[in-house]
């Protein structure tokens, strides 16, 4: 009898403890929701200028169930201070972006909200990854984006689908270059203040079921002051290999900061080589612009194109691909005043891609 009473008391205490833990969890989630929500609302009101931007709010239970508690089976890719997962909510697939609370310092918290607000602003453009909603019930917001059936480009401008590398034909590579150029041009021209992305690279470009490229990651994007062509920042941010040398040495952000990064991006997807490649056993690295420029100066531009796709194009098409490589080199001129503007780049790429298809 005493044993039964003892077990009953233990059971009641255990149940009480579980209820208390559950209540504490609910209180913590509510606090995160209110804290994150107030910050986001303030930022969104400041940005949307009275326009309605429909964004869905997801619960933590939905996110955890969709990603198997952020399990490895749902992992897509990791980049910097965040991880991408595939998740299924109400029979629909989504890309779910989780920021690491251990890597996001107080200084970088603002970047998380920058990402939400600017992604929401770009949701109507077909070449940006569309923000569907978010969950505020974690220490940092978890973002839910449209699904990208064919994943994300890797550091060589390729893509892995179902565990196997897919060789992208040159026609698709040119299409990707053209449409990402259109997206960046939109950032530079569609708003009263020029918006500089600052993080253009293959690993921020997703591909949907129709192989349409979707630019993502606005965490370090910045507006230039209205009527101004540059802004000085406290620290340089971005990815080594894609950083504009002028920006890197002066901390001055201009529209040509994006032009340089785009030029590197274009070279990477055309050559199938990373932005920085090891050249010898001593650990030295050579920038892709230097690599491509060497071939250009020797009149051997066809030698830089990814050999896996060169045999599939005609001699007439090769001329247009080489024109694209030359354009990429112009984007990477060391003096930023010698670089073309994004609108000019977009126009030239449209023409190159059209001529390539007709050849």
Curated annotation (Swiss-Prot):
Domain called Protein kinase: residue spans: 64-356
UniProt keywords, alphabetically: ATP-binding, Nucleotide-binding
GO-annotated biological processes: cell surface receptor signaling pathway
Cited InterPro entries: Kinase-like_dom_sf (IPR011009), Prot_kinase_dom (IPR000719), WAK-like (IPR045274)
Ranges of Basic residues composition bias in the record: 1-10
Disulfide bond positions: none
Family of the protein in this entry: Belongs to the protein kinase superfamily. Ser/Thr protein kinase family. ZRK subfamily.
The record's note on its domains: The protein kinase domain is predicted to be catalytically inactive.
Name the record gives this protein: Non-functional pseudokinase ZRK2
The species this protein was found in: Arabidopsis thaliana (Mouse-ear cress)
Gene behind the chain: ZRK2
